Amino acid sequence: MAKADKKKYSGATTNKQVAAEKHLTSVFKFNTDLGQHILKNPLVAQGIVDKAQIKPSDIVLEVGPGTGNLTVRILEQARKVVAVEMDPRMAAELTKRVHGTPAEKKLEIMLGDFMKTELPYFDICISNTPYQISSPLVFKLINQPRPPRVSILMFQREFAMRLLARPGDSLYCRLSANVQMWANVTHIMKVGRNNFRPPPQVESSVVRIEIKNPRPQIDFNEWDGLLRIVFVRKNRTISAGFKSTTVLEILEKNYKTFLAINNQSIDETENLQSLIKQKIETVLKETGLAEKRAGKCDQTDFLKLLYAFHQVGIHFS
């Protein structure tokens, strides 16, 4: 990917901002166990903010603001920034950084673990994401009652490529199929290790995630439950995934729940596990997916499978 155009961003990054960033990234001892790798390149930071296309009326959620190198740029464009930060030291430095400036009234800092924090309404999410919460963060955003219009997220390069992978790609996995059902994902830029302090061990990428509107009319837990089974070994046949004793026990339990909800009695003389196996075989045969591999299947294949299972009372959550 081409390097950021310095002329494009030079007007948005002041000498004062650059000096503040250099100071803050030089005095802190960062906790890499918390994924603290501060983005120090002002051109990359400005490029990320510009890609969010922030409106003056927008509320922006920032996850892991650190010392505020992205935050101060977001504050210039947004109505309000809600920053979720786990490290009290970082929160204190960010507070000091905006103290006495017009941006101070526009910043709200929520101190705590993002995954355990109840989020307020927001229009956009921007994050230099701590890599250990990459997947949980994506699914928390997707499952918001009112999901953001757009999310601009920095991830470990391989994780970003998994989000973008298509059927047949080596990196195509449950994450790929799951996220792409609910959102459109595009790659924005690569970010090298030397753009961070301290440098991480891996390269990074920035992606844009836009939640589909309207949302697909399927239950998230049902969809996710099916994918968890078929992607256990993505290069094995789909039928192989349904032969696991654990899977059969889960489906049997769910089937009993389905019957109870629909006021249908269980035939005590019938071997329920044999019935479940028979239903699975029938569905896989009729859909023509028994011998296909999950790593080669697309959304249409999985939707066909999910619908067929539901038709015979087999559920995944």
Swiss-Prot record:
InterPro entries per record: KsgA/Erm (IPR001737), rRNA_Ade_Mease_Trfase_CS (IPR020596), rRNA_Ade_methylase_Trfase_N (IPR020598), rRNA_adenine_dimethylase (IPR011530), SAM-dependent_MTases_sf (IPR029063)
Catalysed transformations (reactions): adenosine(1779)/adenosine(1780) in 18S rRNA + 4 S-adenosyl-L-methionine = N(6)-dimethyladenosine(1779)/N(6)-dimethyladenosine(1780) in 18S rRNA + 4 S-adenosyl-L-homocysteine + 4 H(+)
Sequence positions that bind S-adenosyl-L-methionine: H37, L39, G64, E85, D113, N128
GO process terms (BP): maturation of SSU-rRNA from tricistronic rRNA transcript (SSU-rRNA, 5.8S rRNA, LSU-rRNA)
Pfam families: RrnaAD
PANTHER family, per the entry: DIMETHYLADENOSINE TRANSFERASE (PTHR11727), DIMETHYLADENOSINE TRANSFERASE-RELATED (PTHR11727:SF7)
Similarity-based family: Belongs to the class I-like SAM-binding methyltransferase superfamily. rRNA adenine N(6)-methyltransferase family.
Stated name of the protein: Dimethyladenosine transferase
Name of the gene: DIM1
